[in-house]
Amino acid sequence: MKSQRIFITGSLVLAASAALTLAQAPAPRTGPGVQAAQDAKEPDVLKTCKVPPPAPAGRGPAPQGRGPAPPAGPREYTVTEIPGVIAAGQKWTEVWKADGNNADGIIATKDGGILLAQNDNSAVLKLDKDGKVSTVYSDTDTGGALTMSPKGVLYIASRGLNASIWELAPKRKMFANKYSGDSFDCIGGVLNDVMADSKGGVYFTQAGLFYADAKGVVTKYGENLRTNGVTLSPDEKTLYVTNGPTLAAFDVLKDGSLTNQREFAKLEGGGNGDGSAVDSMGRIYVSTNPGVQVISPEGKYLGLIPTPRGIITLAFSGPDKKTLYAVVLLREGDPPKQSDQIISIPMLAQGYKGRAK
């Protein structure tokens, strides 16, 4: 009888332990706020791919989506003069901060504010020039990057399951979600950055460089690229895309197709390129872990604008578009929690006014 009681007691303990383990196990992550690659339902999507994505090692060592891990805390920095770009001694100022993966793909608004995509919240916020915040779009399915064409058409990269590019304004509708008949998820990597042109198309990066024409038909361009940020010159004759520690360039043809791939510049300040933007003179600005790296339209390295932490994306806005904004990815506390910070700095250079970014 005693042995039976011990057996029953032991069984009850094991059952209770198993129940507690099940209760503590996190539910599978799926739905808005979860990037496709982390979604519990992604394996089912990948089973439908005619051409499956490459193994993770095939994406190369460059980070996909958020750039390099930041240092533990802020670092000392000194801004030196870059003629025509920034005066010596300028300082970065915090203008906004929020918990989670909730700031990326920033672009300017006409009134001097910025729009920012929120991954976790699946929303788009407007941060006005006075620091006031409002939600302008919701239900963006893990929106992670924004772009606006010179004609004012606003697009967002939705990074959730079955990633896609959506038009948000003037009319909300699907723009592109297939490559060679497959879901964008079959490409691999993360739907990263987007750049709209004046022809009605959108360039985007996702484990490579792609162009969705005005009808949403997608073509891939380039070889041996580890892409992240993408932008166009003010005259739209040249496309720039970050390629690890370098910046690549392509000539843009009349139909938006690309040719003449070349290494345009090395990021001499160190780190891999993430986001990018241009100013009114055609200079290119690349966000990296050391800070903002500035390159002339001829491909000459002009210098580094150091930042207190690594930055993942950037855009000109503010009065007369002479303020440079950047997004910092933070991990603070014990245990560390992710948050995002937007910082700004006064510039001599002026952002290109012909489009939002």
Stretch-by-stretch model annotation:
Residues M1-R5, L314:
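Positively charged n-region of N-terminal signal peptides that target proteins for export
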Residues A25-K357:
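Sequence-structural signature of mature extracellular/luminal beta-sheet repeat domains
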Residues T9-T21:
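Bacterial N-terminal signal peptides
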Residues R5, T9-L12, K129:
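Intrinsically disordered, low-complexity repeat segments enriched in small/polar residues
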Residues M1, L22-A23:
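Hydrophobic, aliphatic-enriched repeat segments that assemble into extended interaction scaffolds
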